[in-house]
């Protein structure tokens, strides 16, 4: 009975609400004792909704502020970001740029009014690879050495592209007009040296020295040593050999002097022992030795001289 009564009351309320809505739309007069039932979100649900809307608004404001700050700090523009500019020819970097990971590029150019500087705390390594990814060349600039690993290393002139220095497994070529060594110890060569011309600096002496071994100069078509405005001296501690296997030894000068030649003795009844001897005769022993003998009316050379008998 109570349940049916409640259902009747609810149906009555719904009928009254429909009547009220109909009278509002048709501008009909409402009864004085009509009751309104509000429809919406009230209580703690309304407070939670306002809180979430306020939190979302604050989050949007903070996000917008952070976005504006990042754009300002990173210097975002239409052309690029910060020191990075995107152009038709590629990417342009202004100022100092740091790369934390490997950089793969085809060409690197600096500005026309400034040099290109590559800097690293440890070393700078430039690698060249083929289409299969294999290493074909490497240039490493370290704190103690500069190393280049390649099949052939070349240094060319900037004007005409002439090769100034090249090195490979077989040979090292120096294409400069002049090789200058300014070290105090000079140039040290462990093996033979082939060159068409050796010349000293103007007003400087040229010295070829082997401190502990012998020094040899060989040429199939001759060796020429000339001193146009000075003396030529050859000194040694022991023997000095001048040998020509098929030709001759030619001495051509206004005067030829042979110093410290031994003087042989010659006894003759006609010679005056008291007179001072000023003229000597140059004698040659059978073994090729030279000595001086006092000049007389005839030849004073004797093959049995004591000088010729010396070893």
UniProtKB/Swiss-Prot annotation:
Topology versus the membrane: Single-pass type II membrane protein
Cellular compartments per GO CC: cytoplasm; cytoskeleton; plasma membrane; sarcoglycan complex; sarcolemma
Cystines in this chain: 285-301
The keyword Oxidoreductase is annotated on this UniProt entry: no
Keyword Glycoprotein: yes
Cytoplasmic side: 1-50
Pfam families listed in its UniProt record: Sarcoglycan_1 (PF04790)
Topology feature Extracellular, residues: 72-311
Residues that carry a glycan: 75, 123
GO biological process: membrane organization
Annotated InterPro entries: Sarcoglycan, Sarcoglycan_gamma/delta/zeta
Chief localization: membrane
Family of this protein: Belongs to the sarcoglycan beta/delta/gamma/zeta family.
Protein name: Zeta-sarcoglycan
Organism: Mus musculus (Mouse)
Organism ancestry: Eukaryota, Metazoa, Chordata, Craniata, Vertebrata
Protein's gene: Sgcz
